[in-house]
């Protein structure tokens, strides 16, 4: 259920702001969004997996915090990112 190393590298290179950028909010939000999508698919088939559901809620909260931070610092980057990721806002 976790992200493969190849997929993680692809996401980092796609959303990175510089060559070796792995910690920018854009990269972190993209990685969290991928994990959230994987957990959502898992929960569609395993509806009673409450431990995974709690993990999903924690990831969503973490992503929400990073999105709030990015919106507070640079609204243009925030708008571009949610458009690229297809998040509803």
UniProtKB/Swiss-Prot annotation:
Which PROSITE patterns does the record match to this protein? RIBOSOMAL_S15
InterPro entries the record matches: Ribosomal_uS15 (IPR000589), Ribosomal_uS15_bac-type (IPR005290), uS15_NS1_RNA-bd_sf (IPR009068)
Q: Does the keyword Translocase apply?
A: no
A cellular-component GO term for this protein: cytosolic small ribosomal subunit
Task: Tell me which domain of life the UniProt entry assigns to the organism this sequence originates from.
Answer: Bacteria
Query: Could you tell me the keywords of this UniProt record?
Result: Ribonucleoprotein, Ribosomal protein, RNA-binding, rRNA-binding
Recorded GO molecular functions are: rRNA binding; structural constituent of ribosome
User: What is this protein's name?
Assistant: Small ribosomal subunit protein uS15
Give the species.
Granulibacter bethesdensis (strain ATCC BAA-1260 / CGDNIH1)
């Amino acid at each position: 259920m976790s992200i493969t190393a190849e997929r993680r590298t692809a996401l980092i290179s796609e959303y990175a702001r510089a060559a070796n950028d792995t910690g920018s909010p854009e990269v972190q939000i993209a990685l969290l969004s991928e994990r959230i999508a994987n957990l959502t698919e898992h929960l569609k088939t395993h509806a009673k997996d409450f431990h995974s559901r709690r993990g999903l809620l924690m990831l969503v909260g973490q992503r929400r915090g990073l999105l709030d931070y990015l919106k507070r610092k640079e609204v243009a980057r925030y708008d571009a990112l949610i458009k690229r990721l297809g998040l509803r806002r």
